[in-house]
């Protein structure tokens, strides 16, 4: 094999002159050896010679070591041989160093971005390349552990609704606690129990959700709407209009609560067609209703047998009082009950009775009662019936007794208004 002579050594040996102290100088000013500068003194060192040989071999891309370099036994030669084993050396290329911004961007990238980098080729199988890749991998693993420990965990809270966002009074900021809204009953975690689910309280085709017909007590969506005058008048009627205004109305008795402990969570408005009760509760309710009906039937039968349904006033009435009409009032009771507001002068100022004579005999005859007839008991005012007493009250007292012959023959005095508007014949 052809051996190429090392130009560095040949130039160095030709320019050296032996001296007494073993020191030689180089007089070549135009030397091509970069390690031998002009006008410098150097000591002959075999280590430097071996390093020059190794450098020349690496430039010439020779894998075989030179004879001169193999003769030297230096620890520096072993490290140089390890560097010379690289197949694709980058000694001949001089790339500029990377910018600082590029290095900072590479450090701030996520761990997942490492997969997007170009994987090393199979040709770069030199020990230095593999060591650099191992060091990069260890640095990235260290970064992933360091960044993963400080990365905030994924929050498992539900997204805030508009009501929670508007609340800024929380101790730990907005959304510290949830405000229940009208749509919370439709959430899945509220309807896990199929028996007591809020959504199951309202059936899909519920009659309670339909528009009621005008003038009807029940809600039937299949019945056509009736907007006639009769239906509207029936719906506008007032109940119990003939009762006394002083009667106390019990709302709890007329509108009993439809509460049922078997359907918890449902109010009276939703129990119209709400969740059904259990079978045991329905059977128990039917038994109680049957017992109540049976008790009422026995009570009515006993009252009919004993005749206790008659009132005490009916039993105490005499035959004479039983034949009288219901609107009969005695003169004494009418006289004592009469008030100044019910006097004839204030009730009908235009009538002829305003200027009635003040004869005591006539008044005595009107108010005179027969000594044989017993005074009837004071009548009780009926709360549930219609008061059919004629109006005004004095008309009944004047027309209850017939007029005497003296009263018939006596001409009636004409009042002021009657004389004013009387036509002269």
Curated annotation (Swiss-Prot):
Protein name: Protein pal1
Family: Belongs to the pal1 family.
Ranges annotated as biased composition (Polar residues): 8-34, 122-135, 310-353
Membrane spanning stretches: none
Biased composition annotated in UniProt, kind: Basic and acidic residues: 144-167
Major location category of this protein: membrane
Topology in the lipid bilayer: Peripheral membrane protein
The species this protein was found in: Schizosaccharomyces pombe (strain 972 / ATCC 24843)
């Amino acid at each position: 094999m052809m051996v190429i002579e090392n130009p560095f050594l040949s130039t160095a040996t030709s320019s050296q002159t032996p001296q007494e102290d073993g020191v030689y100088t180089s007089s070549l000013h135009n030397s091509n050896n970069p390690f031998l500068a002009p006008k410098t003194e150097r000591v002959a060192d075999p280590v430097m010679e071996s390093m020059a040989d190794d450098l020349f071999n690496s430039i010439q891309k020779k894998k075989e070591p030179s004879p001169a370099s193999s003769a030297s036994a230096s620890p520096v030669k072993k490290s140089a041989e390890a560097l010379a084993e690289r197949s694709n050396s980058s000694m001949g290329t001089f790339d500029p160093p990377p910018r600082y911004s590029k290095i900072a961007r590479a450090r701030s990238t996520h761990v997942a971005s490492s997969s997007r980098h170009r994987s090393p080729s199979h040709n770069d199988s030199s020990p230095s390349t593999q060591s650099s890749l191992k060091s990069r991998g260890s640095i990235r693993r260290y970064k992933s552990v360091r960044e993963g420990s400080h990365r905030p965990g994924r929050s498992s809270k539900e997204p805030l609704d508009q009501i929670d966002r508007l609340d800024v009074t929380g101790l730990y900021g907005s959304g510290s606690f949830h405000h229940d809204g009208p749509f919370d009953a439709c959430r899945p975690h509220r309807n896990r129990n199929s028996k007591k689910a809020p959504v199951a309280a309202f059936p899909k085709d519920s009659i309670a959700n339909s528009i009621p017909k005008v003038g009807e007590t029940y809600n039937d969506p299949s019945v056509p709407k009736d907007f006639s005058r009769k239906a509207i008048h029936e719906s506008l009627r007032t109940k119990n209009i003939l009762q006394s205004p002083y009667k106390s109305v019990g709302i709890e008795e007329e509108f009993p609560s439809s509460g049922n402990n078997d359907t918890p969570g449902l109010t009276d408005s939703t129990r119209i067609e709400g969740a059904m009760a259990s079978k045991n509760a329905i059977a128990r309710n039917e038994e109680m209703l049957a017992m109540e009906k049976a008790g009422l039937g026995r009570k009515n039968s006993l009252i009919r047998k004993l005749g206790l349904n008659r009132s005490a006033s009916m039993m105490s009435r005499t035959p004479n009082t039983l034949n009288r009409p219901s609107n009969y009032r005695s003169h004494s009771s009418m006289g004592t009950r009469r008030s100044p507001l019910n006097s004839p002068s204030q009730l009908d100022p235009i009538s002829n009775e305003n200027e009635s004579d003040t004869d005591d005999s006539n008044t005595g005859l009107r108010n005179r009662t027969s000594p044989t007839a017993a005074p009837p008991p004071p009548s009780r005012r009926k709360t549930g019936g219609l008061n059919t007493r004629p109006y005004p009250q004095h008309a009944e007292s004047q027309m209850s007794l017939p007029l005497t012959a003296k009263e018939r023959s006596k001409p009636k005095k004409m009042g002021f208004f009657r004389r004013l508007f009387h036509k002269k014949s």
